[in-house]
Amino acid sequence: EYNGYKVYWEDGAQFTPPHDKGVTEEVMAITDLSTVKTMGAQEAKAKGLYEIIGAAIDDKYIAQVKAQVVNQGAIDRMQDQITIVYTPLHGTGNIPARRVMKELGFTHVYVVPQQELPDGDFPTVSYPNPEAAEAFALGLKLAEEKNADLVLATDPDADRLGVYVKDSKTGEYHSLTGNMSGCLIGDYVIGQRKALYGLPEDGAFIRSIVSTNMADAIAKYYGIQLVEVLTGFKFIGQKILEFENTGKGTYLFGICLLYTSPSPRDSTSS
């Protein structure tokens, strides 16, 4: 069944105005499908217009995600003291998420076995959404068995991340909203960068119009500008590209996008 598609621009983010308008106009101008030029897969491959993403691209992606780590030393010191439970919720996040955690040095990572492999029927959940508490039922059960500190869940197409953290005093697990985790990651990334390298005078923290105003307070605390954009990671990507093209502004963080690449929303990098 056709389920739509996403179109990305050369910066790696989904395209934004005016490019979206141009594509829409071209599509709407078609009055007879028989006039549309087509090309078979073999011809497209021969002309370098068709490429199946494989291991080489996977490796580049993983390398980019790992490059976003701001303090590997902190991970090295704590990797044996942190226990993580992870579930891909029958989706696509299993291999990349586990690979990144392993290569960064996290040794105590447990995957929910019932939800490890891809399954479009999602037999263990009625709604495979990491923002829903029900999706964490098996993950939290395993977390209690393993005395885990952190429970992570990615949605089926691995572009959203759900988080539960353990209260060290009570032993209870509490969920973090996207605004909570975004601010925690943002404060950590910017704070670490300040401590290690200092912050640029034109540093910017980006949030969408629906994200928490706590981001404003974080930006004020670090003395950097707060930039507000429309809802959607593509608009964060658009602002990043604007910074790069104009030389006015240095991207530090966006809720919740760590660095300039990869630009789409992505649970593995988070």
Model-predicted segments: where are they?
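Flexible loop/turn segments at secondary-structure boundaries
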Residues: 1, 92-94, 118-121, 158-162, ...
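Short Gly/Thr/Asp-enriched flexible loops that form oxyanion-binding sites at enzyme active sites
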Residues: 2-9, 159-178
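Gly/Ser/Thr-enriched, mixed-charge loops and adjacent short helices
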Residues: 3-135, 142-143
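Proline/glycine-rich low-complexity loops and linkers
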Residues: 26-53, 167-254
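Short, surface-exposed connector motifs at secondary-structure boundaries
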Residues: 74-83, 147, 195-203, 222
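Accessory "access/gating" subregions that flank catalytic or transport cores
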Residues: 86, 102, 139-154, 162-166
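Conserved small/polar residues in nucleotide/adenosyl-binding loops
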Residues: 259-266
